[in-house]
Regions:
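Sequence/fold signature of self-assembling virion shell proteins
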Residues: 2-52, 59, 63, 163-192, ...
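Assembly/oligomerization interface modules of large self-assembling protein complexes
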Residues: 32-112
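Extracellular structured ligand-interaction cores
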Residues: 97, 132, 215-217
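Hydrophobic side chains in beta-strands
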Residues: 100-102, 222, 308
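Short helix/loop capping segments that flank catalytic or ligand/cofactor-binding pockets
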Residues: 110, 144, 229-231
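Alpha-helical scaffold segments that mediate packing/assembly in large oligomeric complexes
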Residues: 113-204, 332
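Short, basic/hydrophobic alpha-helical segments
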Residues: 205-212, 216
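Beta-edge loop/turn motif
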Residues: 216-226
Length: 333
């Protein structure tokens, strides 16, 4: 509780003490934490299943060596020309910015009121930091929402326009023919998945993957609703069995525990299911880029402006069937 020497601020005192200068000072003091706040927000869910690539200046190309070599019976005369090629995939980051006007008194009273309920009396600098953290975390929330379905649109104004998300990249590669049945990295479901066929459908999809992919630990990235269908179907089939004591199934039945479900909230409505590894889905950023910044200004009376800039981009590192498999869903309509 607040002590006599730590009296709670009145609204007028709050207005006088929490100024644009205080917020700007807080933004400078906690610049790195604010710039990384969107990433920290992503760690709550999506970054558990994808890989963050920091320090990307404009772009970085990942080369994949594809070739074949094998042993044969010993021969002094053995000599073969190498059959190989290097395939490069480029992770590009794009600068984005946010200019957000807010009523300082509404925000201050909301955050300050929360502290009063808890019996706290935060310092002015602590309040300023919390205010900025709320906005920075919101930026991370939108990044998380659109990391799969974003479509690069230079004329856009939202996070969904900043870069091509993973699903957008995948859909473009399907159209280009780089993901196909012929290449062995595409499976097409023959019927819509529901609560009566989800187990068989997902098992069939997994079985269709390349043997090398099935031999390593992978994630199955899917719409949470499809995962719930799988759980319901599995429970309906096996609920009475003695060993079936755990409703939540973390790995796909029949994968020998190698394929772990990744039912991400931001995959809701996705038209595909993906089997791959964490290091195949790359999110690029650069917190040290001079364009990355968080600031607060007062451009007009009674209105503060939160300014944030950062660079982000996504890429699928390899489309190789040995590391990547896509299942194209069939619509129920």
């Amino acid at each position: 509780m607040a002590t006599p020497s730590q009296q709670l601020m009145t609204p007028d005192e709050m207005k006088e003490r929490i100024t644009p200068e205080i917020l700007e000072t807080s933004a400078r003091q906690f610049q790195r934490q604010l710039i990384t706040m969107p990433i920290e927000t992503l760690r709550e869910e999506t970054l558990k299943y994808i890989t963050l690539v920091p320090g990307v200046r404009n772009s970085v190309t990942f080369g994949e060596l594809q070739g074949d070599a094998q042993l044969g019976p010993w021969s002094r005369e053995r000599k073969e020309d190498a059959d190989y090629k290097i395939v490069g995939r480029t992770l590009q980051v794009y600068p984005g910015n946010c200019t957000y006007d807010f009523d300082p008194m509404e925000v201050f009273n909301s955050i300050y009121g929360h502290h009063i309920i808890n019996g706290d009396n935060p310092s002015v600098m602590q309040l300023a930091r919390e205010i900025l953290a709320v906005f920075a975390a919101a930026i991370g929330g939108h990044l998380n929402d659109h990391i799969w379905n974003a479509v690069r649109n230079v004329s856009g104004t939202k996070t969904v326009d900043l870069f091509d998300g993973f699903d957008t990249i995948i859909n473009k590669e399907i159209v280009a023919g780089n993901i196909s049945k012929t290449k062995g990295n595409l499976f097409e479901f023959s019927e819509a998945i529901d609560r009566t066929n989800a187990v068989d459908s997902l098992k069939e999809f997994y079985v269709s993957a390349n043997k090398h992919l099935k031999g390593i630990p992978t994630f199955m990235y899917l719409d949470p609703e499809i995962y719930r269908m799988y759980l319901d179907d599995h429970q309906a089939r096996n609920g009475s069995l003695p060993y079936n004591t755990n409703y939540e199934k973390l790995t796909l039945e029949g994968s020998n525990g190698k394929c772990t479900f990744a039912p991400l909230s931001n995959l809701a409505g996705s038209g595909t299911i993906k089997i791959s590894t964490k290091n195949n889905f790359l999110l690029g950023t650069d917190i040290n880029n001079q364009e990355s910044q968080a600031r607060v200004k007062e451009y007009k009376p009674w209105v503060f402006t939160f300014l944030f800039a950062g660079v982000y981009g996504a890429q699928v590192r390899t489309l190789s069937k040995e590391r990547f498999h896509v299942g194209k869903l069939k619509s129920s309509l």
